[in-house]
Each structure stands twice: as C-alpha cells, then as structure tokens.
C-alpha cells in the first residue's frame, strides 16, 4: 500500500519517482533503522510518556534527515555508483536527476529539519549542527578510511542525545550508553550491508569495515552486537528499566543469532537480508521499553 501510494505520485508528476528513488523513501528500511533507536531515547527521556510535540518533531525529523542523507550519499558516490551492481541504476547515475537538483533537494530537506529543531530549545539546536556535520561528511569517508560505518553510526545515533535535551532540557551521562550501543549496532548491521558490495568495492578501491574485517567479518559483527546489548543492559540499569525491557533485548539477541547463522556462506542476498532483519531487533527493543513503562 505504501509503495503503491508513492508510485501514484508518478502519475501526477513524471519526475516524481526519480526523486522518490533518490531520497529512498520507497525503501523505508533506513527510516526504521534510524527511527527505532531515536524512539528508544524519546521514550526513556519522557519516562514512558514523552510529549506529543517531541514525538512529532523526532519522527518527522528522522524521515527528513534520512532522505537528506540518501541524497548527499548519492551525490558523493555519483562517480563510483556506476561501477557497483547494486547502485548502477540510481537516478544520479542514469541522468534522471542532475547534481544541482540533488544539492538543492538536500538543502531543502536539511532546512525543513532545522525548522523542526527550532521548536525545541537552545541546547538541542546547537546539538543539531553536530548531527548535520556527521550526516554530510559520512558519504565521503569511504574514500579515506576503512571505518565509514563508524561515522554512520555516530550520525545515526545523534538524535538520541538530542531527544533527551529536547524532552527534558538535560543530557544525563547514561544517555551516552544508549548512544554507544546504537553506534556499535549500526557498525554491525552496516557491515552486513557493505558485505553485499565488497567484491565491487575491492575492484574500485572503496573502503569499508567489510573490506577491513575480511574473513573475520561475521564474528566481529556478532561481537559488536553483543557489546551493544551490553551497553543497553547498563543503560537499562541506570534508567531503572525492568523485565519487559530485558525481554526486548533477548528478542534482539535472537535476531542477531539468526543473522549470524544465515550469513554463514556470505552470499550477497543473505547478507542483505541480515541487514534488513536488524529492523526487527530495533523494534523489539523499542516495544520492550514501551511495555516496561506501560505496566508500571
């Protein structure tokens, strides 16, 4: 239904689908992976009852900034995407969208996101500049370092401290445990994603943790996921979360175990499915948090 609604826009404007593909709103997995951890922080900051204003700002902000991130990523990769099987038909490569149009769209999306942040407070506004810097520089990191996934993790986690300052005006030390947990988790699942393109990346000299880790990739991913769960357990203790939260963590651990097993042959499709599967881990943790506060 969601995809059909988006495709119906193409009948209104012949170029609409090109921009939908550029922003990847036709592929909501990235929205989910950014949304769930942001909502972890929103719910914990609000002690189970966050303000509707905060929820609205961060849900819409996730949608806008994920779209902006996809646009700037494709702009940064416009000279290499044509050499990668998975990305060779993207709008900037096919010429359906120009570089100037992509940059203009990026500016509009960032501007709309900043308007949302203006409805919070000074601390959150200042923090938003850090998030923008991370989102803008991430796509270029794969040219210079084998750790672009770490920069992505930092960017994807930046909404968490912002959620605390927006909801409470304060940033407790334990909030950084959530930040570190999500950073570790993001590096793990995005390494699965990078494993899909590893053969192409090796040919064209693109760097990633998948290239760096080599045959140790799956073990390192599982270790990162385990460390993320450990940080979440520590955060749960600091925020006095109860049994439902830990059941959510157990469900997430089950997701991670399935991903490890299913990628044992390192087939492209299996690695991509493992990446997609992380959405369920994030959702399980969020539902655990919501349930924990609901039963009090």
From Swiss-Prot:
Gene3D superfamilies: UbiA prenyltransferase. GO terms for cellular component: plasma membrane. It is found in: Cell inner membrane. One of its GO terms (biological process) is ubiquinone biosynthetic process. Pathway: Cofactor biosynthesis; ubiquinone biosynthesis. Its cofactor is Mg(2+). InterPro entries: HB_polyprenyltransferase-like, Prenyltransferase, UbiA_prenyltransferase, UbiA_sf. It is a multi-pass membrane protein. Its EC number is 2.5.1.39. One of its GO terms (molecular function) is 4-hydroxybenzoate polyprenyltransferase activity. Belongs to the UbiA prenyltransferase family. NCBIfam families: ubiA_proteo. PANTHER family: 4-HYDROXYBENZOATE POLYPRENYLTRANSFERASE, MITOCHONDRIAL, PRENYLTRANSFERASES. Catalyzes the prenylation of para-hydroxybenzoate (PHB) with an all-trans polyprenyl group. Mediates the second step in the final reaction sequence of ubiquinone-8 (UQ-8) biosynthesis, which is the condensation of the polyisoprenoid side chain with PHB, generating the first membrane-bound Q intermediate 3-octaprenyl-4-hydroxybenzoate. This is 4-hydroxybenzoate octaprenyltransferase. It comes from Pseudomonas savastanoi pv. phaseolicola (strain 1448A / Race 6) (Pseudomonas syringae pv. phaseolicola (strain 1448A / Race 6)).
């Amino acid at each position: 239904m969601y995809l059909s609604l988006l495709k119906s826009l193409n009948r209104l404007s012949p170029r609409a689908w090109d921009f939908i593909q550029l922003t990847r709103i036709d592929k909501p997995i990235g929205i989910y992976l950014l949304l769930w951890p942001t909502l972890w922080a929103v719910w914990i900051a609000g002690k189970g009852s966050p303000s509707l204003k905060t929820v609205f700002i961060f849900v819409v902000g996730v949608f806008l900034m994920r779209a902006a991130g996809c646009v700037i990523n494709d702009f940064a990769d416009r000279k290499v995407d044509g050499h990668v099987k998975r990305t060779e038909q993207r709008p900037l490569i096919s010429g359906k969208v120009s570089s100037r149009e992509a940059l203009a769209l990026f500016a509009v999306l960032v501007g709309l996101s900043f308007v949302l942040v203006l409805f919070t407070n000074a601390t959150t506004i200042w923090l938003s500049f850090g998030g923008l810097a991370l989102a803008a520089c991430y796509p270029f990191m794969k040219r210079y370092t084998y750790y672009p996934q770490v920069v992505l993790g930092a960017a994807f986690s930046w909404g968490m401290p912002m959620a605390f300052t927006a909801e409470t005006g304060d940033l407790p030390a334990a909030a950084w445990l959530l930040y570190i947990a999500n950073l570790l988790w993001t590096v793990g699942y995005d390494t699965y994603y990078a494993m899909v393109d590893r053969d192409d990346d090796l040919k064209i000299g693109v760097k990633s943790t998948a290239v760096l880790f080599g045959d140790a990739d799956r073990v390192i991913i599982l270790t990162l996921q385990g460390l993320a769960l450990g940080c979440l357990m520590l955060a749960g203790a600091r925020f006095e979360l109860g049994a439902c939260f830990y059941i959510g963590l157990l469900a997430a651990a089950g997701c991670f175990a399935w991903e490890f097993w299913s990628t044992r042959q390192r087939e492209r499709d299996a690695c991509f499915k493992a990446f997609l599967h992380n959405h369920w881990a994030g959702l399980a943790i969020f539902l655990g948090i919501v349930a924990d506060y609901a039963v009090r």
